[in-house]
């Protein structure tokens, strides 16, 4: 079964819109796990516009499943991850001020830097994953960084699926097959939803984990958080 890690950035966005502590991020994280979620993902950004660095620290005691911290490995982020020691760190090349992630790493151009950062995290017992596009050269480059896993950036698949083009899965299948051959674990995320997750899961060999936030929280507004988490779990079996 592919594990479901729920990204709770949108909960923090809602909280920060009014100040105070409603909704309570820590309670939501605890409830998601109680409902069956198998992990919690956060993506703190330098401006702390949704997840705050203190949230990352506070969640350490709350997350009893798998704790995944995503972000661009700048100095402050590296320090935060080493302090919190999550189960997994996912390295994402997002620009400062970006609304959301928009591309994977160039694992050839950034290979030496990624290798250095990955080794630091691994020395501290943290599993590493790097965000990549479904491009075979980037998968090969990822292997050379020493990362434990890759996270396939699934925006292109989701867009094509919405248009009715199921062939949009093809590059992801090839990327996953190569990753499996190279011994890389496979995660995936970005624009996955109740509409497309089952098709994606059924076609990607060796898919270990998906990280879903925006769609899941949006769907929960209509269907309820407990219900939506379990709907995803059924589709990921």
Curated annotation (Swiss-Prot):
It catalyses: 3-amino-2-oxopropyl phosphate + 1-deoxy-D-xylulose 5-phosphate = pyridoxine 5'-phosphate + phosphate + 2 H2O + H(+). Keywords: Cytoplasm, Pyridoxine biosynthesis, Transferase. It is an enzyme of class 2 (transferase). It comes from the Bacteria. The keyword Metal-binding does not apply. 1-deoxy-D-xylulose 5-phosphate binds at residues 45, 50, 100. The record marks 151 as: Transition state stabilizer. CDD domains: PNPsynthase. GO terms for molecular function: pyridoxine 5'-phosphate synthase activity. GO terms for cellular component: cytosol. Pathway: Cofactor biosynthesis; pyridoxine 5'-phosphate biosynthesis; pyridoxine 5'-phosphate from D-erythrose 4-phosphate: step 5/5. One of its GO terms (biological process) is pyridoxine biosynthetic process. Its EC number is 2.6.99.2. The active site is at residues 43, 70, 190. 3-amino-2-oxopropyl phosphate binds at residues 7, 18, 191, 213-214. It is found in: Cytoplasm. The keyword Nucleotide-binding does not apply. Homooctamer; tetramer of dimers. Belongs to the PNP synthase family. Catalyzes the complicated ring closure reaction between the two acyclic compounds 1-deoxy-D-xylulose-5-phosphate (DXP) and 3-amino-2-oxopropyl phosphate (1-amino-acetone-3-phosphate or AAP) to form pyridoxine 5'-phosphate (PNP) and inorganic phosphate. This is Pyridoxine 5'-phosphate synthase. The gene is pdxJ.
């Amino acid at each position: 079964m592919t594990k479901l890690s729920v990204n709770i950035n949108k909960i923090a966005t809602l909280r920060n819109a009014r100040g105070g502590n409603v909704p309570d991020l820590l309670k939501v994280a605890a409830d998601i796990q109680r409902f069956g979620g198998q992990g919690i993902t956060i993506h703190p950004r330098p401006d702390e516009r949704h997840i705050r660095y203190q949230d990352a620290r506070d969640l350490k005691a709350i997350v009893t499943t798998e704790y995944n911290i995503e972000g661009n490995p700048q100095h402050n982020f590296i320090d935060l991850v080493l302090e919190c020691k999550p189960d997994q760190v996912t390295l994402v090349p997002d620009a400062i001020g970006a609304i959301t992630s928009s591309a994977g790493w160039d694992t050839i151009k950034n290979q030496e830097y990624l290798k250095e950062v990955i080794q630091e995290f691994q020395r501290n017992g943290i599993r590493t994953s790097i965000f990549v596009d479904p491009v075979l050269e980037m998968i090969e480059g990822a292997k050379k960084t020493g990362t434990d896993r890759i996270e396939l950036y699934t925006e292109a698949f989701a867009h094509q699926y919405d248009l009715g083009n199921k062939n949009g899965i093809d590059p992801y299948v090839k990327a996953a097959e190569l990753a499996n051959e190279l011994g890389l674990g496979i995660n995936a995320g970005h624009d996955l939803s109740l509409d497309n997750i089952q098709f994606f899961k059924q076609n990607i060999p060796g898919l270990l984990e998906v990280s879903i936030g925006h769609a899941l929280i949006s769907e929960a507004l209509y269907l309820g958080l407990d219900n939506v988490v379990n709907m995803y779990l059924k589709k990921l079996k």
